[in-house]
Swiss-Prot record:
GO terms for biological process: DNA replication, removal of RNA primer; mismatch repair. A divalent metal cation binds at residues 89-90, 194. InterPro entries: RNase_HII/HIII, RNase_HII/HIII_dom, RNase_HIII, RNase_HIII_N, RNaseH-like_sf, RNaseH_sf, TBP_dom_sf. GO terms for molecular function: magnesium ion binding; RNA binding; RNA-DNA hybrid ribonuclease activity. It catalyses: Endonucleolytic cleavage to 5'-phosphomonoester. It is an enzyme of class 3 (hydrolase). Its cofactor is Mn(2+); Mg(2+). This is Ribonuclease HIII. Residues 83-300 form the RNase H type-2 domain. Endonuclease that specifically degrades the RNA of RNA-DNA hybrids. It comes from Streptococcus pyogenes serotype M5 (strain Manfredo). It is found in: Cytoplasm. Its EC number is 3.1.26.4.
Length: 300
């Protein structure tokens, strides 16, 4: 996926709107004056006059529309590392026990040497011990914004007849983490989110969020393997999740496993026997199938 950002004048803006009129789409971003999608490329025209094209065919569409590609502010492929980037990632959404940690981090090219010396990589490839050693160093050096949604709060917000589902809650957390980081004066050239849903679905859920920002987003699967900024966020988020999981376990007197396998079913059934459902409301995501499996284990 390529991202093209251009500055166009009023005359070209009117011409563009006429050309793309049959491909118009809605956008809830208050900073966007016009939005369209053609040939898989999303086109966003901001009130400031900035034009953003996102998609693998961005260059081809720009040529088709006779846009001044030579005046591109930047053209970034998915593995571009030579511009200041905000990367956002989450950890914990697939684990029955523990909350959800979302982190947005700002990495400037001048940080690359420091990060490579630390061996920063996708946190999923690193041991928990290594993550716990690296994360404090990253937190000290790299501008970031961390958010932790506790299981108790998660259960209040996510589920049937509740404000959020498992996808929309992550949209809210990513959006808020990035928004708060931008409020600190950070000025990225690109913002990358580790894709957990489609861009259109993300934007649909974003409509009900209070805070918005004008910066375009890049959605990349396995982004932590392509962008150092996302890898940093992945590591900090993993450490935050592990700390939360450990603290919850200490509070209850049980070692809580990560993940959503049979080990989680077993511990959950033990917690139900010892403390009742309130212990799972405090430590786990109740809408997971593990809750029913744990209840079934009690009857055996």
């Amino acid at each position: 996926m390529n991202t093209l950002v251009l500055k166009i004048d009023t005359i070209l803006s009117k011409h563009l709107k006429k050309q793309l009129a049959p491909y118009t789409i809605s956008s809830q971003n208050t900073y966007v004056a016009f939005a369209a999608k053609k040939n898989g490329v999303t086109v966003l025209l901001y009130k400031s006059g900035k034009l953003v094209l996102q998609g693998n065919g961005a260059n081809a569409l720009a040529q088709e529309l006779n846009l001044p590609v030579a005046k591109t502010v930047f053209e970034a492929s998915n593995n571009s590392q030579d511009i200041p980037i905000i990367g956002s990632d989450e950890v914990g959404n697939g684990s029955y026990f523990g909350g959800i940690a979302v982190v947005a981090s700002f990495v400037d090219p001048k940080d690359h040497s420091f990060l490579k010396k630390l061996g920063v990589d996708d946190s999923k490839k690193l041991s928990d011990k290594t993550i716990q050693q690296i994360a404090p160093l990253l937190e000290k050096q790299i501008p970031h914004q961390s958010l932790l949604l506790s299981p108790k709060k998660y259960n209040e917000l996510v589920g049937k007849s509740k404000p959020y589902n498992a996808i929309s809650i992550k949209v809210a957390l990513h959006n808020q983490a990035i928004f708060l980081l931008l409020q600190k004066g950070i000025q990225p050239k690109q913002i990358v989110i580790d894709a957990f849903t489609s861009q259109s679905n993300y934007e649909k859920h974003l409509k009900k969020e209070k805070n918005h920002f004008p910066n375009p987003l890049t959605f990349q699967e396995k982004a932590e393997s392509h962008y150092l900024a996302v890898a940093v966020s992945s590591i900090i988020a993993r450490n935050l999740f592990l700390d939360n999981l450990d603290q919850l376990g200490q509070d209850l007197g049980y070692q809580l496993p990560s993940g959503a396998g049979s080990a989680s079913d077993k511990v959950a059934s033990q917690l139900l026997a010892a403390y009742g459902m309130s212990s799972l409301e405090y430590s786990a995501k109740l809408h997971f199938a593990n809750t029913h499996k744990a209840q079934a284990l009690l009857t055996k």
